[in-house]
Structures are given as structure tokens and as C-alpha cells.
């Protein structure tokens, strides 16, 4: 089954690569319209998925990732329209020039071909990935988690209906709707057909893909994100940033999980933090210093060492007091996932040092980690957030779904 999907996707990719920007945008507009027109069928499938997931004991954080609402689905359709408004990178000449040999050389952006995406309980990924792949002339094979297989199947049917209406092969966007996990292992070996693989899920999925895939893999999305409250931080705006980074949508990978507090500000800062977190319903996981300093009003539990590597994805926050900037940077290097980390400070020298020494895909000064997002970065819907360094890093927008080819123009030109 998968080989036939691969053959069809590869054939579709050749047709997609020839489309003009206008033709691709018309497809995306049709998809957005169909998502809204067929909203009832998608939401009905999603309700079944959510009910099944709840019966299976999924956490509230996972249920939040899984659930669609009319507002969320409308926002997904609007994200597709936003992709229409983005500049098409395909065909862009990156650089080039006339060589001494007389050969005119240019490096031009082209589609990757076929992209494979394996993801878990995130139904929005189906549309986000499909829209970005189509905009860049790529076909895509999707494998969502068993928790979302009804939602994904309904969504892909809508997308394929739009493709067919625009005269394009339905195989341009395909989904593996069989929840059998053995198919993941088979997909990881489809290097004959899939040009790049993107896993979006937990650490176990990323480890499996890195170790078993014969396809180039882009890993990331696991966010043990940190905020360091420097000794010079302005407490009031710092608290607003922390509340945003922790509570706006706790189930996302750009949510802060560990707060590092400089010891020189801890006595003034921790009581204010506890009050604010109590109002926000956040449970603090405090180190020994924090446990001694606080006695409410926020719920406070002792920090377990293994929790420093946790992606809680819930209203839980580690709080650790560090001696200085060196301690904060060392902690991030040991426990961070190179996703998103921030410093809150009024000392621009310390800010510059933090930016230079923290090796993450996104580093912020006096801002929330929640900004690490394709839409917030102006990239449109993102296909993933990469925490590796080769090919793509950070939110992966359109350019990350392209490669390039060298093109030489001659006039009977030969090598001497």
C-alpha cells in the first residue's frame, strides 16, 4: 500500500513543480473555501476522535491538542489564505553570475519533491503541512496519530476534493489512515519516494525516526523552554511575560517549562511570582531554595531532578534559583532542547551575552517564548519547529521546504 502511495506522490510532485504561483494560490483558496464549506463533516469526525481519546484516558493537554472547534477550524482556513499571500520561493535565484569561462551560473530554488510528515494528536498539522507543501510545489504523505485518524481522514478528503476541482492529482496530498504502527517503520524506509521526513511528536517518535529512517530527517518541536530572570529584571513586566509564556496555551512546544531566577532578585521576585501563579492556576515545582522561601499562595511541590528535562505541556512550572548568569547558561545547556529560551533583564550587556551563548533555535530578550511560531514570525503556517542546525532551524516556513539546483547557461561553452 505505501509503495503505491509513494509512486503516486512522486508522479504528482512532478506536476506540482511546474505550477505557477497563481495556479498554486488558486488551489489553496479552494482548499480554504472547502474547509469552511465542509466544516460540519470535519468537526463531526473530530468529536468522535476526542470522545475516543477521552475514553482512552488521554491527558487534558493532549485532548486540547486534539480538539477542533468552529473557531479553530476557521482559523486554520484563514492560515491557508495567509499562505496565498506569502511570496513563493520556488524559482527564486539565490545567487549567481558570469564565470571567467563564459558560463552564466545561477542557484535557483526548487521544490524538494515529496515530503513525509509523521505527527501525533495535532489535527491542524494536516492542513498546515499540506498548504505549505502545495505552495512550494511539493507532494506530501501524512501519517497522523491514531488519536486523530478520523479527523485527518475527513480533512484529507476535503483537500483532495479541492485538488480534483483544480485539475490536480489527489495523490498530491495523501494520508496513511491505517493506525497500525508498523506502517511507520515501513514509511521510514521509503527513501526511494520521500525526499525529506519531518516527525512532529514526542521524544520517542523523534528517536525512532533518527535511528530507523533511511530518509533525511528534520527533528525538533520538543520544547523544554527556559526563561532566566536576571538580577536587574523589572519585576512587573517580567511577570506578565512569564504568565503569557506559561498559560496562554500550555500544550504547545514553545511554552516555558523552567524558570531560572538569579539569587540576587529571588527574595523580591519569588513572592510576587507565587501570587501571580496562584491567580493563573499554575503549580510551581520548586528547588530547595524556592521551597524554603515560599509558603503559598501558589500550589508548591518539591522539584524532582528528572522534571528538569520534562516537557510538561500543562500548568506546571519548574522554578530554580541560580547563582548567576553562568549558572543559568549552564543549566540551559544541560537541560534545554535548543528550542526557545529567554532572558528578562534591564542589563543589555547581560542580554547580549545570553543571546551569544545560549545555542537555541530562538533566543529572546524581554519577550515571551510563545513567539516561536511560523505565523508570529511572518512565515505563515509552519510545517514544524526544527531544533537541529542542518537545512532548517526554528519555525519552518516555505523556504525550508525547498532545495536548490545549479543552472549553467552557455553558448557552446566548454571547459578548458
Curated annotation (Swiss-Prot):
Catalytic function, reaction form: L-glutamate 5-semialdehyde + phosphate + NADP(+) = L-glutamyl 5-phosphate + NADPH + H(+)
GO CC annotation: cytoplasm
Cross-referenced SUPFAM superfamilies: ALDH-like (SSF53720)
InterPro entries recorded: Ald_DH/histidinol_DH, Ald_DH_C, Ald_DH_N, Aldehyde_DH_dom, G-glutamylP_reductase_CS, Glu-5-SA_DH, GPR_dom
Gene Ontology terms describing biological process: L-proline biosynthetic process
Enzyme class: oxidoreductase
Pathway connected to this protein: Amino-acid biosynthesis; L-proline biosynthesis; L-glutamate 5-semialdehyde from L-glutamate: step 2/2
GO molecular function: glutamate-5-semialdehyde dehydrogenase activity; NADP binding
Predominant place of localization: cytoplasm
Oxidoreductase keyword on record: yes
Statement: the UniProt record of this protein carries the keyword Amino-acid biosynthesis: yes
Highest taxon, organism lineage: Bacteria
EC number of the protein: 1.2.1.41
CDD domains listed in its UniProt record: ALDH_F18-19_ProA-GPR (cd07079)
Intracellular or extracellular location(s): Cytoplasm
Function: Catalyzes the NADPH-dependent reduction of L-glutamate 5-phosphate into L-glutamate 5-semialdehyde and phosphate. The product spontaneously undergoes cyclization to form 1-pyrroline-5-carboxylate.
Family: Belongs to the gamma-glutamyl phosphate reductase family.
Alphabetical list of PANTHER family matching this protein: DELTA-1-PYRROLINE-5-CARBOXYLATE SYNTHASE (PTHR11063:SF8), GLUTAMATE SEMIALDEHYDE DEHYDROGENASE (PTHR11063)
Protein name: Gamma-glutamyl phosphate reductase
Taxon lineage: Bacteria, Pseudomonadati, Pseudomonadota, Gammaproteobacteria, Enterobacterales
Amino acid at each position: 500500500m505505501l509503495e503505491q502511495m509513494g509512486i503516486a506522490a512522486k508522479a504528482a510532485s512532478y506536476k506540482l513543480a511546474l505550477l505557477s504561483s497563481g495556479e498554486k494560490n488558486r488551489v489553496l483558496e479552494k482548499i480554504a473555501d472547502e474547509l469552511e464549506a465542509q466544516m460540519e463533516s470535519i468537526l463531526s469526525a473530530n468529536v468522535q476522535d476526542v470522545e475516543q481519546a477521552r475514553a482512552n484516558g488521554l491527558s487534558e493537554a493532549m485532548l486540547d491538542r486534539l480538539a477542533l472547534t468552529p473557531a479553530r477550524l476557521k482559523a486554520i482556513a484563514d492560515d491557508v489564505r495567509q499562505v496565498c499571500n506569502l511570496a513563493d520561493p520556488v524559482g527564486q535565484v539565490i545567487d549567481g553570475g558570469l564565470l571567467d569561462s563564459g558560463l552564466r551560473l545561477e542557484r535557483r530554488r526548487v521544490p524538494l519533491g515529496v515530503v513525509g510528515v509523521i505527527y501525533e494528536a495535532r489535527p491542524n498539522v494536516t492542513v498546515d503541512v499540506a498548504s505549505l507543501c502545495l505552495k512550494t510545489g511539493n507532494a506530501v504523505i501524512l501519517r497522523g496519530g491514531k488519536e486523530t485518524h478520523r479527523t485527518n481522514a475527513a480533512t484529507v478528503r476535503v483537500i483532495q476534493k479541492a485538488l480534483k476541482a483544480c485539475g490536480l492529482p489527489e495523490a498530491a496530498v495523501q494520508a496513511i489512515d491505517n493506525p497500525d504502527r508498523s506502517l511507520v517503520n515501513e514509511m521510514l524506509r521509503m527513501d526511494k519516494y520521500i525526499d525529506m521526513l519531518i516527525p512532529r511528536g514526542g521524544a520517542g517518535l523523534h528517536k525512532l525516526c533518527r535511528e530507523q529512517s533511511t530518509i533525511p530527517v528534520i527533528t525538533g518541536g520538543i520544547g523544554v523552554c527556559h526563561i532566566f530572570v536576571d538580577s536587574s529584571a523589572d519585576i512587573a513586566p517580567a511577570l506578565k511575560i512569564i504568565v503569557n509564556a506559561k498559560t496562554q496555551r500550555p500544550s504547545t512546544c514553545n511554552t516555558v517549562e523552567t524558570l531560572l531566577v538569579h539569587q540576587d532578585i529571588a527574595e523580591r521576585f519569588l513572592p510576587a511570582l507565587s501570587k501571580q501563579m496562584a491567580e493563573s492556576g499554575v503549580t510551581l515545582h520548586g528547588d530547595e531554595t524556592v521551597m524554603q522561601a515560599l509558603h503559598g499562595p501558589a500550589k508548591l511541590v518539591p522539584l524532582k531532578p528528572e522534571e528538569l528535562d520534562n516537557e510538561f505541556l500543562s500548568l506546571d512550572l519548574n522554578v530554580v534559583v541560580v547563582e548567576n548568569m553562568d549558572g543559568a547558561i549552564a543549566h540551559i545547556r544541560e537541560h534545554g532542547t535548543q528550542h526557545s529560551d529567554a532572558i528578562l533583564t534591564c542589563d543589555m550587556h547581560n542580554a547580549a551575552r545570553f543571546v551569544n551563548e545560549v545555542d537555541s533555535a530562538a533566543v529572546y530578550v524581554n519577550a515571551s517564548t510563545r513567539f516561536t511560531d511560523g505565523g508570529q514570525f511572518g512565515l505563515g503556517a509552519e510545517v514544524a519547529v526544527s531544533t537541529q542546525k542542518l537545512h532548517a532551524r526554528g519555525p519552518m516556513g516555505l523556504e525550508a521546504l525547498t532545495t536548490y539546483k545549479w543552472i549553467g547557461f552557455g553558448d557552446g561553452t566548454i571547459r578548458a
